[in-house]
Amino acid sequence: MRSTPLGTTAVSPASIKHNSYGYGRFVSSSGVSNFSIHRRRRHSSFSISQAPSQINSGACNASQIVDLFPAVSPEIVVREARLEDCWEVAETHCSSFFPGYSFPLDVVLRVDRLMAMVMGFSIPPGCQRTCLVAVIGSSVDETICFGSDDFKIGAFDAKISLNKGYVAGILTVDTVADYLPRKGPLRQRRTGIAYVSNVAVRENFRRKGIAKRLIWKAEALAKNWGCRAIGLHCDLNNLGATKLYKDQGFRSIKIPEGATWPQPKTSPDTRFTFMMKLVNNNNTQALEQFR
């Protein structure tokens, strides 16, 4: 799937500054299959406490609408996004990367992002793309799911749960290699390397280890897909994100002099560093091939 900053809306990327609360940078999904019912054993209970945002008189913005009904629980579950999560995923993305927009533009941005994710874009045969969500207030063991493990609508699993929880963080991981340097004189697409993008955590849930858990889950998926390494682009000015990735074992890869590597399409003054980490320790040469 080709990545676009906001899918369909004619908003100039140059007019949108990258926000330091997003962990890196953003990009967008697709996939297909049997019907199954998943019953998870309920082993614990949780309470829902309402902590509505203060809403001033007049029109409230999109983030305030979502924050009216948060499900609060100490448990964090990272899983693949489902169709029912789509609005909260769009809200988390836009509130992290495009804060400060008020009604009606904030709603337009969220609807645009939602359409881009649900409609999706085609991906090359044999490639994978998944949106992960960190959910507060719903245990994996408490969830009853209806739907298919394989069928997807855009970026989302076509499954519905009776107790879905509250999306606090998001991450996209794929093997499409749109933002990896091409290989050889024929500029072939690289294989065996997963790529992370769109890492964002809601402001109220930051500094709780959610981004780390999303990264861990992405690494596990990359291993499951048979990848030898995982990579990402990080805004050089986002020191918090840079430290996060370095603490998780990512290394900055120096671009060879004179080489032109693909980079995320954001505001022109944003500078990125490309970082990688081995997920298959049997292949110690995976990072050296980029030098």
From Swiss-Prot:
Tissue: Expressed in green tissues.
Protein residues bound to acetyl-CoA: V199, A200, V201, R207, K208, G209, I210, A211, K212, N238, L239, G240, Y245
Catalyses which reaction(s): an N-terminal L-alpha-aminoacyl-[protein] + acetyl-CoA = N-terminal N(alpha)-acetyl-L-alpha-aminoacyl-[protein] + CoA + H(+); L-lysyl-[protein] + acetyl-CoA = N(6)-acetyl-L-lysyl-[protein] + CoA + H(+); N-terminal L-alanyl-[protein] + acetyl-CoA = N-terminal N(alpha)-acetyl-L-alanyl-[protein] + CoA + H(+); N-terminal L-seryl-[protein] + acetyl-CoA = N-terminal N(alpha)-acetyl-L-seryl-[protein] + CoA + H(+)
UniProt keyword Plastid, yes or no: yes
Keyword terms of this UniProt record: Acetylation, Chloroplast, Plastid, Transferase, Transit peptide
Protein name: GCN5-related N-acetyltransferase 4, chloroplastic
Species for this entry: Arabidopsis thaliana
Entries under PANTHER family matching the protein: ACYL-COA N-ACYLTRANSFERASES (NAT) SUPERFAMILY PROTEIN (PTHR47443), GCN5-RELATED N-ACETYLTRANSFERASE 4, CHLOROPLASTIC (PTHR47443:SF3)
